[in-house]
Amino acid sequence: MRTIKRILIGLIVIGFMMVLSGAIMKSYQKSKELEALKIEMEGISRQNQLKKEFKDSLISEVNNYINKKAPKNRISGEAIIDACIKYNIDIKFVLAQAQLESGFGTKGIAAKTNSVWNVMSYDGWSANKIIKNGRGYNHPNESIEPYMKLLKNKYLVDGKTEYDMMQKFISFTGHRYASNPKYEEQLKYIYNRIDKQTNIDELLNNYLNI
């Protein structure tokens, strides 16, 4: 009887130790999983922080250029950047045209209509650049989206690029963006100046590829 009792006690102890060992192992595995998750979350947090820092630097670069050329402007560099990324349009090209068209909304009729690129309306296939009854946008930022849609749907089509537009700024329907015969030459000059004076491309690449 004593032998049987000892055997039973031994089996119970062994069983308990196995259960305890399994619990310890599960706890260890859980701890390692939590540690790995923590490291992953810290990595994501750091990545997000870097992404924010890169975008802030890009915004600062764009705003600094705009403010230098047109101190009284009211347009948002961040709004321009976001729209350019959305429509995959060269930021420097957009800035160059905004500077040429209206001094970033501070010159000519654009100062009254807030139409930075002198595009008053766009419905997807037609653009009306004639301002009727003095109507315009409530804020310069509102003129960004119509301008982007106009470029993307009428000019930057059939493989045409921003570079092509600086050679001959004509839509697929044969419409010139501006009547000024030296428009492309002036646009390209400003574009090249922006390219030399800023680090927009590098900062944008850092932001998009972090």
Residues of each region from the PLM?
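Catalytic cores of secreted/periplasmic lytic hydrolases that degrade extracellular macromolecules
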Residues: 2-93, 99-210
